[in-house]
């Protein structure tokens, strides 16, 4: 997972809860002042659907959860496994009370159901770390309850990385810290899985910004064609990630064949192994597209060139197209001094790994099956009516 040090303000609309007879509920979206995502590779370190709206600030997607009656907005992250939040009297909240007022913080003394387990937690990221102690409390997300949910409470400060609270929903061996497992345990959903859909980065704050995570169900209105279910591939070093095998091309340039790709919603960019990234740069040169360096490590180019940019990925026979429009990050969304005609490239050098973050994930609809160790993907669709299908058995292909 990764987060940025830049701060933006996004105006977000309120969304009313869906009618109960549809079998799903929506958490409201609100105006937030959030930290935007940036290049930071992590250390490798009633049985109905429950739908929580995600809100997009640049490309950092957040979801709201209530812990002991206290509302928290945290960045959703398939690349880590627990939720951690700021304690109300943490050094971070003392340094920047406005952010804690905006995103929320957790005060154990305000909840009669809060319990300090006395067990420490520590998560190392590419920049910084989060640590503290695990607590349990009653959680509510999208109107559904998960009693006794376990999460981390951080009393530290921003010097350890400067990122917002993180809602880890990745591969997890401890069911007590998995929100989807706890929703299943409480009878809110039948299957321990969730589907995710990300909107276009340019739609942040508009009525069309309808990113969502749906626990226990899929939304067939968010993809075109059929879903392809593929097994998760184990990674070395004991780390657990949503890793799958894929091949990739940029235009007519073959980048890689049958290599490991990590799907990580807590990462903004698409990172390619160095050799693959250099081949991509060569492909840009062939298209007469030149990247210019900007502060913060961003690489800019004219947005008018987006129509030339096209990736094709193959996942076990399922072909996914990622366009320049999918990959582009509006330059003036990151830096107000950048002209609106400039886009920042959403692909960068990943060193020895392929790490596919939000600039890839918004081109697909993805389903993460934690029970069966599988991922299902399809090409994303926009503008279709929502159609929620409760999953009690196999994910439909």
Swiss-Prot record:
It comes from Yarrowia lipolytica (strain CLIB 122 / E 150). One of its GO terms (biological process) is fungal-type cell wall organization. It is found in: Secreted. Its EC number is 3.4.23.-. The active site is at 77, 264. Disulfide bonds join 93-100, 303-343. This is Acid extracellular protease. Its main location: secreted. GO terms for molecular function: aspartic-type endopeptidase activity. Belongs to the peptidase A1 family. Residues 61-378 form the Peptidase A1 domain. InterPro entries: Aspartic_peptidase_A1, Aspartic_peptidase_AS, PEPTIDASE_A1, Peptidase_aspartic_dom_sf, SAP-like.
């Amino acid at each position: 997972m990764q987060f940025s040090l830049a701060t933006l303000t996004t105006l977000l609309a309120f969304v009313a809860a869906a009618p109960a007879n549809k079998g799903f509920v929506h958490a409201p979206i609100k105006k937030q002042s959030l930290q935007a995502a940036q290049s930071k590779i992590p250390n490798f370190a009633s049985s109905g659907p429950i739908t929580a709206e995600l809100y997009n600030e640049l490309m950092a997607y957040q979801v709201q959860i209530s812990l002991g009656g206290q509302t928290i907005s945290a960045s959703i992250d398939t690349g880590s496994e627990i939720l951690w939040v700021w304690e109300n009297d943490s050094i971070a909240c003392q340094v920047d009370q406005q952010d804690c007022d905006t995103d929320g913080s957790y005060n154990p003394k305000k909840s009669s159901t809060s319990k300090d387990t006395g067990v420490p937690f520590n998560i190392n990221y590419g920049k910084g770390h989060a640590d503290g102690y695990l607590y349990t409390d009653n959680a509510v997300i999208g109107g559904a309850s998960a009693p006794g949910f376990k999460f981390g409470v951080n009393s530290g400060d921003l010097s350890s990385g400067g990122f917002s609270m993180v809602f880890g929903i990745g591969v997890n061996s401890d069911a007590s810290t998995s929100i989807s497992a706890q929703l299943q345990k409480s009878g809110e959903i039948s299957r321990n899985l969730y589907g995710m859909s990300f909107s276009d980065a340019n739609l942040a704050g508009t009525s069309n910004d309808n990113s969502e995570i749906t626990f226990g169900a899929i939304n067939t209105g968010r993809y075109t064609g059929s879903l392809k279910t593929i097994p998760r591939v184990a990674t070395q070093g004991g780390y657990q990630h949503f890793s799958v095998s894929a091949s990739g091309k940029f235009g007519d340039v073959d980048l890689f064949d049958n290599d490991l790709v990590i799907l990580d919603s807590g990462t903004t960019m698409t990172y390619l192994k160095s050799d693959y990234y250099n081949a991509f740069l060569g492909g840009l040169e062939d298209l007469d597209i030149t990247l210019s360096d900007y502060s913060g490590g961003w690489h800019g180019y004219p947005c008018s060139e987006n129509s030339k940019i096209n990736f094709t990925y193959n996942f076990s026979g399922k072909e996914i197209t990622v366009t320049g429009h999918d990959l582009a990050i509006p330059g003036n969304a990151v830096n107000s001094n950048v002209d609106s005609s400039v886009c920042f490239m959403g692909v960068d050098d990943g060193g020895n790994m392929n790490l596919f973050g939000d600039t890839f994930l918004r081109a697909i609809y993805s389903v993460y099956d934690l029970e069966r160790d599988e991922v299902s993907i399809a090409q994303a669709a926009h503008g279709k009516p929502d159609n929620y299908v409760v999953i009690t058995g196999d994910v439909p292909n």
